[in-house]
Amino acid sequence: MASKSLRELIAQADERGLAASGLACLERCLPLLASETDPLGPLWDGLAEGAEGWPGRLAEARDTLAGAAPPGDGEADGAAALIRHMLDAAPDDWQVEPLREWADDCSVAALELHHRLDAGPAGEPTASAVIEVLKGCREGEPTHAGPLVTAELRRQLRVLEILAQGEGRIGLRQVQRVSTEGQRVLRAVVSRRARVQR
Protein backbone atom coordinates (compact mmCIF):
# COMPACT_ATOMS: atom_id res chain seq x y z
CA MET A 1 0.00 0.00 0.00
CA ALA A 2 1.36 3.42 -0.93
CA SER A 3 2.37 5.80 1.85
CA LYS A 4 -0.04 8.60 2.63
CA SER A 5 0.80 12.14 1.57
CA LEU A 6 1.45 14.93 4.02
CA ARG A 7 -1.91 16.49 3.21
CA GLU A 8 -3.71 13.19 3.92
CA LEU A 9 -1.93 12.64 7.24
CA ILE A 10 -2.82 16.13 8.46
CA ALA A 11 -6.44 15.63 7.40
CA GLN A 12 -6.68 12.43 9.49
CA ALA A 13 -4.85 13.56 12.65
CA ASP A 14 -6.60 14.18 15.98
CA GLU A 15 -6.19 17.21 18.25
CA ARG A 16 -3.02 16.02 19.98
CA GLY A 17 -1.47 14.90 16.71
CA LEU A 18 -2.20 18.24 15.06
CA ALA A 19 -0.89 20.26 17.99
CA ALA A 20 2.29 18.19 18.17
CA SER A 21 2.79 18.33 14.40
CA GLY A 22 2.54 22.12 14.33
CA LEU A 23 4.76 22.44 17.39
CA ALA A 24 7.39 20.15 15.87
CA CYS A 25 7.48 22.21 12.66
CA LEU A 26 7.95 25.34 14.72
CA GLU A 27 10.66 23.80 16.89
CA ARG A 28 12.75 22.69 13.92
CA CYS A 29 12.86 26.30 12.69
CA LEU A 30 14.06 27.79 16.00
CA PRO A 31 17.78 27.82 15.02
CA LEU A 32 16.88 30.78 12.78
CA LEU A 33 16.51 32.77 16.02
CA ALA A 34 19.59 33.72 18.03
CA SER A 35 18.29 32.43 21.33
CA GLU A 36 19.48 29.81 23.77
CA THR A 37 16.10 29.59 25.45
CA ASP A 38 13.64 26.75 24.95
CA PRO A 39 10.35 28.61 24.48
CA LEU A 40 8.45 25.49 23.48
CA GLY A 41 9.39 23.30 26.43
CA PRO A 42 6.21 24.08 28.40
CA LEU A 43 4.05 23.25 25.39
CA TRP A 44 5.72 19.88 24.93
CA ASP A 45 5.26 19.18 28.63
CA GLY A 46 1.56 19.95 28.38
CA LEU A 47 0.70 18.10 25.17
CA ALA A 48 0.04 14.84 26.97
CA GLU A 49 -2.54 16.66 29.11
CA GLY A 50 -4.50 17.86 26.10
CA ALA A 51 -6.94 20.75 26.40
CA GLU A 52 -6.47 21.45 30.10
CA GLY A 53 -3.12 23.21 30.03
CA TRP A 54 -2.87 24.31 26.41
CA PRO A 55 -3.95 28.01 26.61
CA GLY A 56 -1.75 28.88 29.58
CA ARG A 57 1.31 27.10 28.23
CA LEU A 58 0.76 28.70 24.84
CA ALA A 59 0.78 32.17 26.41
CA GLU A 60 3.99 31.31 28.27
CA ALA A 61 5.69 30.15 25.08
CA ARG A 62 4.66 33.32 23.24
CA ASP A 63 6.11 35.52 25.97
CA THR A 64 9.40 33.64 25.89
CA LEU A 65 9.69 33.66 22.11
CA ALA A 66 8.93 37.38 21.94
CA GLY A 67 12.29 38.07 23.58
CA ALA A 68 14.32 35.96 21.15
CA ALA A 69 16.32 37.98 18.64
CA PRO A 70 17.09 36.97 15.04
CA PRO A 71 20.74 36.63 13.95
CA GLY A 72 20.74 40.15 12.52
CA ASP A 73 20.20 40.46 8.77
CA GLY A 74 17.19 41.15 6.60
CA GLU A 75 16.65 37.55 5.59
CA ALA A 76 16.91 36.40 9.21
CA ASP A 77 14.46 39.10 10.29
CA GLY A 78 11.94 37.78 7.78
CA ALA A 79 12.41 34.20 8.97
CA ALA A 80 12.10 35.29 12.60
CA ALA A 81 8.86 37.13 11.85
CA LEU A 82 7.45 34.01 10.19
CA ILE A 83 8.42 31.84 13.16
CA ARG A 84 6.76 34.24 15.61
CA HIS A 85 3.67 34.36 13.41
CA MET A 86 3.52 30.56 13.48
CA LEU A 87 3.31 30.58 17.27
CA ASP A 88 1.02 33.62 17.48
CA ALA A 89 -1.41 31.90 15.11
CA ALA A 90 -1.73 28.82 17.33
CA PRO A 91 -5.37 28.52 18.46
CA ASP A 92 -6.14 28.85 22.15
CA ASP A 93 -9.03 26.43 21.72
CA TRP A 94 -8.21 22.72 21.78
CA GLN A 95 -10.51 21.94 18.84
CA VAL A 96 -9.69 19.79 15.85
CA GLU A 97 -10.52 22.21 13.02
CA PRO A 98 -8.55 25.26 14.24
CA LEU A 99 -5.67 22.99 15.23
CA ARG A 100 -5.74 21.37 11.78
CA GLU A 101 -5.59 24.76 10.09
CA TRP A 102 -2.68 25.76 12.31
CA ALA A 103 -0.78 22.51 11.76
CA ASP A 104 -1.29 22.90 8.02
CA ASP A 105 0.04 26.47 8.07
CA CYS A 106 3.05 25.43 10.18
CA SER A 107 3.81 22.65 7.72
CA VAL A 108 3.81 25.07 4.79
CA ALA A 109 5.89 27.67 6.66
CA ALA A 110 8.54 25.16 7.73
CA LEU A 111 8.84 23.75 4.22
CA GLU A 112 9.10 27.26 2.79
CA LEU A 113 11.88 28.26 5.20
CA HIS A 114 13.87 25.14 4.37
CA HIS A 115 13.30 25.68 0.64
CA ARG A 116 14.67 29.22 0.88
CA LEU A 117 17.74 27.94 2.71
CA ASP A 118 18.21 25.36 -0.04
CA ALA A 119 18.32 28.20 -2.56
CA GLY A 120 21.16 29.97 -0.72
CA PRO A 121 21.72 33.69 -0.10
CA ALA A 122 22.25 34.51 -3.78
CA GLY A 123 19.40 32.45 -5.17
CA GLU A 124 16.11 33.69 -3.73
CA PRO A 125 13.45 31.51 -5.39
CA THR A 126 10.54 33.06 -7.23
CA ALA A 127 7.10 32.89 -5.65
CA SER A 128 5.89 30.53 -8.37
CA ALA A 129 8.84 28.20 -7.79
CA VAL A 130 8.13 28.12 -4.05
CA ILE A 131 4.46 27.33 -4.64
CA GLU A 132 5.31 24.54 -7.09
CA VAL A 133 7.76 22.86 -4.72
CA LEU A 134 5.50 23.13 -1.68
CA LYS A 135 2.50 21.79 -3.58
CA GLY A 136 4.54 18.80 -4.75
CA CYS A 137 5.85 18.11 -1.25
CA ARG A 138 2.42 18.14 0.33
CA GLU A 139 0.87 15.94 -2.34
CA GLY A 140 3.64 13.33 -2.28
CA GLU A 141 5.51 14.41 -5.42
CA PRO A 142 8.52 16.54 -4.30
CA THR A 143 10.20 16.42 -7.70
CA HIS A 144 12.01 19.79 -7.54
CA ALA A 145 12.74 19.88 -3.81
CA GLY A 146 16.29 20.45 -2.58
CA PRO A 147 17.98 18.39 0.16
CA LEU A 148 16.90 20.55 3.10
CA VAL A 149 13.23 20.72 2.15
CA THR A 150 13.24 17.00 1.29
CA ALA A 151 14.61 16.19 4.74
CA GLU A 152 12.06 18.49 6.38
CA LEU A 153 9.25 16.79 4.45
CA ARG A 154 10.52 13.40 5.59
CA ARG A 155 10.50 14.55 9.22
CA GLN A 156 6.99 15.98 8.93
CA LEU A 157 5.74 12.70 7.54
CA ARG A 158 7.53 10.71 10.23
CA VAL A 159 6.10 12.88 13.00
CA LEU A 160 2.54 12.44 11.77
CA GLU A 161 3.02 8.69 11.33
CA ILE A 162 4.29 8.36 14.90
CA LEU A 163 1.40 10.40 16.26
CA ALA A 164 -1.15 8.39 14.27
CA GLN A 165 -0.12 5.31 16.25
CA GLY A 166 -1.48 6.97 19.41
CA GLU A 167 1.29 5.98 21.81
CA GLY A 168 0.81 8.92 24.20
CA ARG A 169 3.91 10.18 26.00
CA ILE A 170 6.16 7.61 24.32
CA GLY A 171 5.08 8.85 20.90
CA LEU A 172 5.62 12.47 21.92
CA ARG A 173 9.16 11.68 23.04
CA GLN A 174 9.82 10.04 19.67
CA VAL A 175 8.49 13.13 17.93
CA GLN A 176 10.78 15.35 19.99
CA ARG A 177 13.77 13.26 18.97
CA VAL A 178 12.85 13.69 15.30
CA SER A 179 12.58 17.45 15.80
CA THR A 180 15.87 17.63 17.69
CA GLU A 181 17.57 15.99 14.72
CA GLY A 182 16.04 18.59 12.41
CA GLN A 183 17.18 21.39 14.71
CA ARG A 184 20.77 20.15 14.60
CA VAL A 185 20.74 20.10 10.81
CA LEU A 186 19.30 23.60 10.50
CA ARG A 187 21.64 24.98 13.19
CA ALA A 188 24.62 23.66 11.21
CA VAL A 189 23.29 25.29 8.03
CA VAL A 190 22.76 28.64 9.77
CA SER A 191 26.23 28.49 11.33
CA ARG A 192 27.87 27.67 8.00
CA ARG A 193 26.10 30.53 6.24
CA ALA A 194 27.12 32.95 8.98
CA ARG A 195 30.78 31.99 8.52
CA VAL A 196 30.57 32.43 4.75
CA GLN A 197 28.99 35.89 5.08
CA ARG A 198 31.66 37.27 7.44
Model-predicted segments: where are they?
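Structured binding/interaction patches within domain cores
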Residues: 19-174
